[in-house]
Amino acid sequence: MNRLQLATLLFWTGDDGIQGRKRLQKVVFLLQQAGCQLECQFTLHHFGPYSRDVADICDEMVAAGLIQEDGGPQTGVMQYKYQLKPQTREMLSQISEEQMTKFQKLGTSLTKENLWSLELGSTILYFYGQANNWTDALSKACDFKRVDSADKKSLEALELAKRIVSQVAI
């Protein structure tokens, strides 16, 4: 993932930004699984797929003053929020990341998705990538997360994961 790609993702969210590091990680993972060429390496973490690449580029852009990071331990608010700074938004409005344009609708909808659905759905998709079997992926993800695979929210997360895979064929 490069700066332009992260800025484009944040541009799609408008003034709302992205609420939380976990949400950012899951949205990037799911976009990449849908075929968006973000080139991030992901490992399985307690909260699902995690990429040091995403964390580093985000920290780098905050340090460079390109994006606004609100929240964190120093503010007493443990969840971070990321938004483009006005000058970055203005610069970005004059250029576009062509490769990402076709993922705008999906990216925008993912940033608004329920956080648990993103977390479990991305974990299911992570396991699906290893076995190419939805039943096994759901079972392994739910075992990993210690939740019931027959639960309504688990099945909704499975549908989210399947929807992401179906995007690759489009």
Where are the predicted features?
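Domain-edge interaction signal
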Residues: 1-170
